[in-house]
């Protein structure tokens, strides 16, 4: 712990020797002379003409104007922030608060930590103003004799210092060193992934296939050489996006007699079911081979939906299955860019495409998500695909060989990450994967913090569930030992367990603790230098996001609370780890989609479409269309929420920032201050979509 300095010493540690003296003359013909102490004699003599008093005055006025402008801007931002906080706190809607449920244990622990911190801070403030500054310094010591004790409060404070140094500091030091080691290991892993990505770019390594793998000699568009492809669109209450995904899939460029589209609707809202039925009927009348499926018994969430669809008898005639979530819009050439990779490659089980986001610039939250997902696809998926032929299936925008699914056990309902589950089991059975970074499928990222938080909870609790369930299968499988080590040590432990553990423990628990236990101080390079460098690496795949490097770093630390809580829930089988909540979508469209929407179908086209349709079918279609228009007009109520854990951590970090201010720790103070403000903004749901 650095010795205590006065506030004037803190902000002006590097003052030069000597006092500068400025002599101003009333006569403008004289120059201004500056005497700056003994070191000025060793400076080179400037031969340029000196500035007169009027020029100096104008320079000072300009600097003062800039300073006032900066202060005005800061005051405006601060006032706007206070106004937003006041407005959010005055919100009294019953749905405007987060439901903690079974995850209350973490919130209780944070509240207890905050209460203890406030008590200790009160002791420290009183001791500071009484002049008791017993930090680690050769010139200062903790009084031990009764003659040095001034009062009962002084005795209690000295007892706290002794307890802190002898019993509290050692375990905190050990835990901090352990977390720092994990932090360094994860940083090395991230650096190796980036180097692998650079090597792929330098060598221009990417999967390739023959230019014309399938020939189509039939003039009417049916090709016997094209394999049979099943396309599945699982959805559940996807009112905003169902039309876009069905439309995009129905326009895939593939022989009509070699493709079947399954719309797997798990919606429990009958009005949404009618909307989807109408959309399917519309495309069926256009000649698309498409069917609508709705389960009466909705078990197993998405995995149960896919498992039920694969049990149909007609699936046996198909060789490959492409899966798209309800908000995904593949390009017409998607199948022609992915399916040919399976030809002459019998060991290939999966071809995964990249995601791109139509709403990545919608707000700050979507921009920060885009940074993470760009790194995931550009670096993690691509490197693992090239060097290991294995990565986690992303659940959508991929094509599976149906034989690989069947040999691996098919879709299982045991976890909420059925995509990762089937990928691990297929890898254990020897199937290889290919990732195509150049094939991109348009989709959405969550625009509200509520939707994003629920998505991240599922993405981080599910892998821990899966790790417990498949650890035995990994150890007893027949794959190579290095593949087993990669699965256990890197895929699960390092990237799914250690990452959320150390990020939350180190920056949200240990760092505030070290402010109250200065004997266990964290070095500056752990707090500042390495995190900034790692954030820089994360931003490399999305260079346009470099202005957001500081918000990205602070927001990732904030999200560590959700990820840590989810990881613990999945590892210890808590109730929240089994919850599946469909991520809310906004129904954003690309520019091409918006242009196509404006081009309405003419009456001539409609008459051509309905030619040959019976009167009963025509009546049914018209009724479905009327229901579609009526249901689509229903308003959907949305509200922002208040998140208790984030707010409690905000006050904890701000309390620790005040303690670091007393100890004159500049870097620690600024980090805790900005991180605390970030937690405050997130806790009040002031990031992402703002709803009335």
From Swiss-Prot:
<feature type="binding site">
    <location>
        <position position="327"/>
    </location>
    <ligand>
        <name>substrate</name>
    </ligand>
</feature>
<feature type="transmembrane region" description="Helical">
    <location>
        <begin position="497"/>
        <end position="517"/>
    </location>
</feature>
<dbReference type="InterPro" id="IPR001173">
    <property type="entry name" value="Glyco_trans_2-like"/>
</dbReference>
<feature type="glycosylation site" description="N-linked (GlcNAc...) asparagine">
    <location>
        <position position="29"/>
    </location>
</feature>
<dbReference type="Pfam" id="PF13632">
    <property type="entry name" value="Glyco_trans_2_3"/>
</dbReference>
<keyword id="KW-0472">Membrane</keyword>
<keyword id="KW-0333">Golgi apparatus</keyword>
<dbReference type="GO" id="GO:0042803">
    <property type="term" value="F:protein homodimerization activity"/>
</dbReference>
<comment type="similarity">
    <text>Belongs to the glycosyltransferase 2 family. Plant cellulose synthase-like C subfamily.</text>
</comment>
<feature type="binding site">
    <location>
        <position position="325"/>
    </location>
    <ligand>
        <name>substrate</name>
    </ligand>
</feature>
<protein>
    <recommendedName>
        <fullName>Probable xyloglucan glycosyltransferase 5</fullName>
        <ecNumber>2.4.1.-</ecNumber>
    </recommendedName>
</protein>
<dbReference type="GO" id="GO:0048868">
    <property type="term" value="P:pollen tube development"/>
</dbReference>
<feature type="glycosylation site" description="N-linked (GlcNAc...) asparagine">
    <location>
        <position position="394"/>
    </location>
</feature>
<comment type="function">
    <text>Probable beta-1,4-glucan synthase rather involved in the synthesis of the xyloglucan backbone than cellulose. Seems to work simultaneously with xyloglucan 6-xylosyltransferase. Xyloglucan is a noncellulosic polysaccharides of plant cell wall and consists of a glucan backbone substituted by xylose, galactose and fucose.</text>
</comment>
<dbReference type="GO" id="GO:0016757">
    <property type="term" value="F:glycosyltransferase activity"/>
</dbReference>
<comment type="subunit">
    <text>Homodimer.</text>
</comment>
<feature type="transmembrane region" description="Helical">
    <location>
        <begin position="667"/>
        <end position="687"/>
    </location>
</feature>
<keyword id="KW-0812">Transmembrane</keyword>
<feature type="transmembrane region" description="Helical">
    <location>
        <begin position="522"/>
        <end position="542"/>
    </location>
</feature>
<dbReference type="GO" id="GO:0099402">
    <property type="term" value="P:plant organ development"/>
</dbReference>
<keyword id="KW-0328">Glycosyltransferase</keyword>
<dbReference type="GO" id="GO:0005794">
    <property type="term" value="C:Golgi apparatus"/>
</dbReference>
<feature type="active site">
    <location>
        <position position="266"/>
    </location>
</feature>
<dbReference type="GO" id="GO:0000139">
    <property type="term" value="C:Golgi membrane"/>
</dbReference>
<dbReference type="InterPro" id="IPR029044">
    <property type="entry name" value="Nucleotide-diphossugar_trans"/>
</dbReference>
<feature type="transmembrane region" description="Helical">
    <location>
        <begin position="180"/>
        <end position="200"/>
    </location>
</feature>
<feature type="transmembrane region" description="Helical">
    <location>
        <begin position="106"/>
        <end position="126"/>
    </location>
</feature>
<keyword id="KW-0325">Glycoprotein</keyword>
<feature type="active site">
    <location>
        <position position="419"/>
    </location>
</feature>
<keyword id="KW-1133">Transmembrane helix</keyword>
<feature type="modified residue" description="Phosphoserine">
    <location>
        <position position="614"/>
    </location>
</feature>
<keyword id="KW-0808">Transferase</keyword>
<dbReference type="GO" id="GO:0071555">
    <property type="term" value="P:cell wall organization"/>
</dbReference>
<feature type="transmembrane region" description="Helical">
    <location>
        <begin position="646"/>
        <end position="666"/>
    </location>
</feature>
<keyword id="KW-0597">Phosphoprotein</keyword>
<keyword id="KW-0961">Cell wall biogenesis/degradation</keyword>
């Amino acid at each position: 712990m650095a010795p205590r300095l006065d506030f004037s010493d803190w902000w002006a540690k590097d003052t030069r020797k000597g006092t500068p003296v400025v002599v101003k003359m009333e006569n403008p013909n004289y120059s201004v002379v500056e005497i700056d102490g003994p070191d000025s004699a060793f400076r080179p003599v400037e031969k340029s003409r000196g500035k007169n008093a009027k020029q100096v005055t104008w320079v000072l006025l300009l600097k003062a104007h800039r300073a006032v402008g900066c202060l005005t801007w800061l005051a405006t931002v601060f006032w706007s922030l206070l106004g937003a906080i006041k407005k959010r706190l005055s919100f009294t809607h019953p749905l405007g608060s987060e439901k903690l449920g079974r995850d209350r244990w973490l919130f209780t622990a944070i509240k207890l930590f905050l209460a203890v911190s406030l008590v200790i801070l009160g002791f420290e403030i009183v001791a500071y103003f009484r002049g008791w500054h017993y930090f680690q310094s050769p010139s200062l010591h903790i009084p031990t004799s009764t003659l040095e004790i001034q009062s009962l409060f002084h005795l209690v404070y000295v007892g706290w210092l002794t307890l802190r140094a002898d019993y509290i500091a050692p375990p905190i030091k050990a835990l901090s060193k352990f977390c720092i080691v994990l932090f360094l290991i994860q940083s090395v892993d991230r650096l190796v992934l980036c180097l692998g990505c650079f090597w792929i770019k330098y060598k221009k390594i990417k999967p390739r296939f023959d230019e014309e793998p399938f020939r189509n000699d039939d003039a009417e568009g049916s090709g016997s050489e094209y394999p049979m492809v099943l396309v599945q669109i699982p959805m559940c209450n996807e009112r905003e996006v169902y039309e876009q995904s069905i439309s995009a899939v129905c326009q895939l460029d593939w022989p009509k007699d070699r493709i079947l589209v399954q719309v797997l609707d798990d919606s429990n809202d009958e009005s949404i079911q009618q909307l989807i039925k109408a959309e399917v009927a519309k495309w069926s009348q256009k000649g698309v081979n498409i069917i609508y499926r709705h389960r009466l018994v909705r078990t197993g969430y998405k995995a149960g939906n896919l498992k039920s669809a694969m049990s149909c008898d007609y699936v046996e005639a198909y060789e490959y299955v492409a899966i798209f979530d309800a908000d995904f819009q593949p390009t017409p050439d998607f199948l022609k860019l992915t399916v040919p990779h399976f030809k002459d490659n019998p060991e290939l089980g999966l071809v995964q495409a990249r995601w791109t986001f139509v709403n990545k610039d919608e707000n700050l939250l979507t921009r920060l998500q885009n940074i993470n997902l760009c790194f995931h696809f550009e670096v993690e998926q691509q490197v693992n695909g090239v060097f290991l032929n294995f990565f986690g299936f992303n659940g959508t925008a991929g094509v599976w060989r149906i034989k690989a699914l069947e040999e691996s056990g098919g879709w299982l309902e045991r976890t909420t990450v059925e995509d990762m589950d089937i990928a691990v089991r297929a890898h254990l059975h020897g199937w290889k994967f290919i990732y195509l970074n150049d094939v991109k499928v348009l989709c959405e990222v969550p625009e509200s913090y509520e939707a994003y938080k629920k998505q991240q909870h599922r993405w981080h609790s599910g892998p821990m569930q899966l790790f417990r369930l498949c650890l035995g299968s990994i150890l007893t499988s027949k794959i190579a030992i290095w593949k087993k080590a990669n699965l256990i040590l890197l895929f699960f432990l390092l990237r799914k367990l250690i990452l959320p553990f150390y990020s939350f423990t180190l920056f949200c628990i240990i760092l505030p603790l070290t402010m109250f236990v200065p004997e266990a101080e964290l070095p500056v390079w752990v707090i500042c230098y390495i995190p900034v460098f790692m954030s820089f690496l994360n931003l490399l795949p999305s260079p346009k996001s470099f202005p957001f490097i500081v918000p990205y770093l602070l927001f990732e630390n904030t999200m560590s609370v959700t990820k840590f809580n989810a990881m613990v829930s999945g590892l210890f089988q808590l109730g929240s780890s089994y919850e599946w909540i469909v991520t809310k979508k906004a129904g954003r469209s690309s520019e091409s989609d918006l242009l196509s929407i404006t081009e309405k179908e003419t009456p001539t086209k409609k008459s051509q479409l309905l030619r040959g349709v019976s009167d009963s079918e025509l009546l049914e279609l018209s009724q479905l269309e009327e229901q579609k228009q009526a249901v689509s007009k229903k308003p959907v109520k949305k509200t922002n929420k208040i998140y208790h854990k984030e707010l409690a951590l905000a006050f904890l970090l701000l309390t620790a920032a005040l303690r670091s201010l007393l100890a004159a720790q500049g870097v620690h103070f600024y980090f805790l201050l900005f991180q605390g403000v970030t937690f405050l903004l997130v806790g009040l749901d002031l990031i992402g979509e703002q709803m009335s």
